Every structure is written in structure tokens, then in C-alpha cells.
Amino acid sequence: LNNPPIPGKQSLAKGSAIPLVKPVEYSTASWRRAVLSLDEHYKAWLLWNYSENTCWEHQVEITQWGWSAFAAQLDGKKMAGKTQERLRALIWLAAQDVKSELAGREVYQYKELAGLVGVSEKNWSETFTRHWLTMRAIFLRLDQASLLSVSESRSEQVAFNLYALN
């Protein structure tokens, strides 16, 4: 995982050779190593959001991390069980909504979300809108932190590899 890529060629008859690794694969290997070295929630977010990797484990990691971050912001505030159950259902929708926004696609409208949760539009605006916005903000921050973290990780790996080669 922390080893630098080593260029090489596979020998063929009559002195010709083909690369073992295609140049594009070779040049992107450091990014792949950087992503795979991240904390699980960062890795899951980047793989799901940017590589379209729909692995169930990534979705579970994103949802669990998102709910933990959201619950921490509630700071022990009392809430009806049914409301909390509906909010749990929204956390994955918030992740999908942020992914859609980042890709320039349509996002959920409040009326649509109220229908999905099974509440009136009035109840949505009074009870759920602020929670929805908080959830979306959590995933937007996750996106920013993940991208920053992978960039830093790659820079550290490249610097280490340059140092190790000298």
C-alpha cells in the first residue's frame, strides 16, 4: 500500500516489450493509494461519490457516519420517537441529495421530501427543514474534508517517495 509504483516492461520475443502497467494506470496509482489510506468514512464517501462505486458497505459507512455526526449536533435534545425515525430515514436521502448537487443534477424539493417522509408540507417546514439542512451541511463538509484529506495524503506519499528515491 505504501510502496511506490515501479515501472517495468514485459519482454517479448525479438527484443520488443510491452508495458506491464498502462501509463494512465501508472500515473493515477498514487491517487488510488491515497484514497485507500484514508479513514473509512472519507474513503467510502470518495469511492461512492466520485467513482460510482455502489458497494453496500460504503453506503452503510456513509449513513452510519452521517447519522452519528447529526446525532452529535442534536446534543441530547428531546425528540419524539416517530420524528427521530423519520430523520433516520432522511440521512441517506441527504447524502444522495448532496451527491446530486455536486454532480450538477436536480436535488430534492421540500414537497417531495415531505411526501417521502409521510408528513404534511406544513409539518415539514416546521419540524424537518432545519434538520434536513443540517444533514446536507454535514455531507457537504464530509465532501470538503475528504477531498482535502486525499490531497494531503497523496502529497505526503509523493514527498516520501521522492525522498526515498534520493
Label for each model-derived stretch:
Residues 1-78, 106-123, 128-166:
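N-terminal interaction/assembly modules
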Residues 48, 55-56, 84-108:
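Short, amphipathic alpha-helical "recognition" segments used to contact nucleic acids or chromatin
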